[in-house]
Regions:
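Non-globular, low-confidence helical/coil segments that flank catalytic cores
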Residues: 1-168
Length: 168
């Protein structure tokens, strides 16, 4: 599973890293949200490596981006006929070998900011858990806390790169 692929100029770096791991395909790619610093390299990756399915969080019509970056990603998804799915809280993705990803957020579709469409997910593998927060900001983090989602983890990414608008 690939979660995000960096800025527009990072696709080749992501491919180089995946090559060092010996990966020839990606079963699942999660695009946490459609800002270029998260999906910019995804089109390059999908052009070069088979991807089984791409996930985005729900994006309300009123804030669907019209950026070239987002359109490039959608174009490659269509060109390569890659299934595109919208995540829902509670959804699980079985990665095999005991690794399971659980989608935790966003917990509402009443969203006015693309950062808050960020997919939040928890990866459990054996006794270890990882929490990936995307760029959710404080109000959405508070809703996630109130939802009762299992946020207990051993390691986590800080929301919105650790900025003051997140990681409440």
């Amino acid at each position: 599973m690939l979660i995000d692929a960096g800025e527009n100029n990072m696709g080749d770096d992501v491919l180089t890293f995946l090559d060092t791991l010996g990966l020839e395909k990606i079963d699942y790619a999660i695009a946490t949200h459609p800002h270029s610093d998260h999906i910019g390299g995804l089109d390059t990756v999908m052009q070069e490596i088979p991807v089984g399915e791409v996930f985005f969080g729900p994006i309300p019509d009123k804030i669907v981006p019209t950026t070239k970056t987002f359109e490039d990603v959608l174009d490659v998804i269509e060109e390569k006929d890659i299934p595109l799915s919208t995540t829902t809280p509670g959804q699980t993705i079985d990665l095999g070998s005991g690794a399971v990803v659980t989608i935790l957020g966003p917990v509402t579709e009443d969203i006015d900011d693309l950062n808050n469409t960020s997919v939040v997910c928890r990866l459990d593998f054996g006794e270890t858990s990882f929490l990936f927060n995307g760029d959710q900001e404080t109000p959405m983090e508070e809703l996630l806390l109130q939802s009762g989602a299992n946020l207990d983890c051993d390691m986590m990414t800080m929301g919105h790169h650790g900025s003051s608008t997140s990681s409440s």
